[in-house]
């Protein structure tokens, strides 16, 4: 499956060139696609390219170790994520017609091949809508991303993660979504995490995790203060109501090198996702920038909350108190 195109002229993916190059992808979409929807297409393409390039690196290592045994190099044990036959970036890049269909099929097949880790991660973008995404536009977009070498050897997780966060902020600025709905300023996140002061091995939960920035900052904090983030494997939990945003959060964590975390889509107040037996799960640390401006937040459900999260809140209190009680239970 791994095929190197010798005609590719990859750019050096340092943080400056990588961030700028990724942002240029938005200009390719500009016009047919609304600015608010840029992230719906650019983030999945970036993640698809990263998966494919890392797969190629793993394939090359296995090939060398096995004395050019191509069958061995494709064994699942040699790859963190599986890419089914015909679903690699290069397979889609070779298409000249119905590119959107090829992209959508490849992404869905990759999700199905990695059900425990990548289910639904590419979101619900309408890649086959040719009124919005013509073959010519998608071809330009594919070629633009193909100039990037996004394997671990050329693009370390911290560099790619910084570029990804740069895009998140740019998209938030572009659509004026700054008030916690999509993006919380990095300085605010850093301050909140310093106040929280999580320790290695503690579980950390963000019930309104957005794009995952607070969980990532908590992970960085633990690594900075304890020197090793391996004790945080399986310790990060988040829930996000918006489908696209929850997918972005998962991609964000993966691209930063996080190896084991739990991000679920759903309404934290109406349908909490994490349980311990018949009760809601509890966590060592809870951090969030909740959507306080939300109008229809589920008061009808909270009046008779089956988990007792309103036991300390009078019925006439504001949703701010109810959200707080959700954190404290």
Where are these regions (language model features)?
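Non-catalytic, mostly N-terminal accessory regions of nucleic-acid modification and defense proteins
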Residues: 1-200, 262-273
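Short, solvent-exposed loop/helix junctions and linker helices
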Residues: 35, 135, 280, 326-327
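Generic hydrophobic, helix-prone segments enriched in Leu/Val/Ile
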Residues: 106-110, 231, 237, 321-322
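Conserved S-adenosyl-L-methionine
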Residues: 178-288, 292-304
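Mobile active-site "lid"/loop adjacent to the S-adenosyl-L-methionine
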Residues: 292-328
């Amino acid at each position: 499956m791994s095929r190197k195109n010798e005609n590719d002229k990859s750019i050096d993916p340092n943080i400056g060139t990588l961030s700028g190059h990724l942002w240029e992808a938005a200009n390719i979409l500009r016009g047919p696609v609304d600015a608010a929807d840029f992230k719906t297409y650019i983030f999945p393409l970036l993640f698809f390219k990263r998966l494919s390039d890392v797969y190629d690196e793993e394939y090359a290592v296995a090939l060398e170790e096995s004395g050019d045994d191509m069958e061995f190099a494709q064994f699942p044990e040699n790859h963190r994520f599986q890419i089914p036959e015909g679903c690699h970036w290069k397979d889609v890049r070779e298409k000249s017609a119905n590119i959107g269909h090829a992209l959508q099929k490849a992404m869905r097949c990759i999700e199905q091949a990695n059900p425990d880790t990548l289910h639904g991660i590419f979101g619900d973008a309408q890649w086959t809508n040719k009124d919005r995404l013509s073959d010519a536009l998608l071809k330009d977009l594919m070629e633009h991303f193909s100039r990037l070498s996004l394997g671990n050897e050329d693009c370390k997780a911290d560099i790619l993660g910084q570029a990804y966060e740069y895009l998140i902020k740019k998209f938030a600025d572009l659509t004026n979504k700054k008030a916690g709905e999509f993006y919380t300023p990095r300085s605010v996140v850093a301050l909140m995490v310093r106040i929280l002061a999580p320790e290695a091995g503690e579980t950390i939960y963000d019930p309104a995790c957005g794009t995952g920035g607070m969980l990532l900052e908590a992970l960085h904090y633990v690594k900075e203060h304890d020197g090793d983030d391996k004790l945080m494997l399986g310790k990060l939990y988040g829930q996000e109501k918006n489908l696209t945003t929850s997918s972005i959060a998962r991609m964000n964590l993966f691209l930063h090198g996080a190896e084991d975390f739990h991000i679920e889509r759903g309404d934290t107040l109406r349908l909490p996702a994490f349980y311990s037996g018949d009760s809601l799960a509890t966590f060592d640390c809870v951090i969030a920038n909740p959507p306080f401006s939300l109008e229809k937040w589920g008061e009808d459900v909270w009046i008779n909350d089956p988990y007792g999260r309103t036991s300390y809140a009078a019925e006439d209190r504001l949703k701010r108190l109810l959200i707080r009680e959700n954190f404290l239970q």
